[in-house]
Amino acid sequence: EFRRVLFRSQLPDALSLLFGATGDTFGAGTTGEVCAFALLLGLAYMLWKKVITWHIPVSIIATVFVFSGLMHLANPVYANPLAVIFSGGLMLGAIFMATDYVTSPMTHKGMLIYGVCIGLLTVIIRNWGSYPEGMSFAILIMNAFTPLINTYVKPKRFGEKPAKK
């Protein structure tokens, strides 16, 4: 509880975090968590070039926003959901790490399940775990579950028609 109160009082506002001001100076942070705006530009470019689909990044960011917002409403000691999204490696993980072709599910429904689970695990690890950044752990855990997601959310085979009832 003390850790959350201490760090919450030191967080800059969400607009400053969006453009990379993470403290008294610009760019105080590790690579990838400095400027969320630049990461969002990278997301827009990859979506425009159809390198990735929107399913994984949007589901991760939306899930983290909703659950951290509910926690903030229940107890204002928890950080503002915009500050949670724009600080740390959440954007980097959601945009560039979780969308890896090899380790992410094949179907759009599977991608949404994968993203929601990553977002939920991220919030849980960040708030109740011993690590302030749970994004990488959440991605690794869900990478292990990707074959299971692919098993239960199978893509239609080429030429397959829906079953008649």
Functional labels for PLM-detected ranges:
Residues 125-165:
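Cytosolic-side transmembrane-helix boundaries in multi-pass membrane proteins
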Residues 25-36, 78-90:
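Structural signature of hydrophobic alpha-helical transmembrane segments
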Residues 46-58, 101-112:
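Membrane-helix interface "capping/anchor" motifs
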Residues 9-38, 42:
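Individual transmembrane alpha-helix segments
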Residues 47-76:
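Conserved mixed alpha/beta catalytic, RNA-binding, or beta-rich assembly cores of soluble enzyme
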Residues 1-6:
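Short, small-residue-biased leader/transition segments that mark boundaries at the very start
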Residues 36-40, 58-66, 84-98, 112-120:
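Hydrophobic alpha-helical segments embedded in the membrane of multi-pass proteins
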Residues 81-90, 111-113, 129-142:
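Loop-to-transmembrane alpha-helix initiation sites
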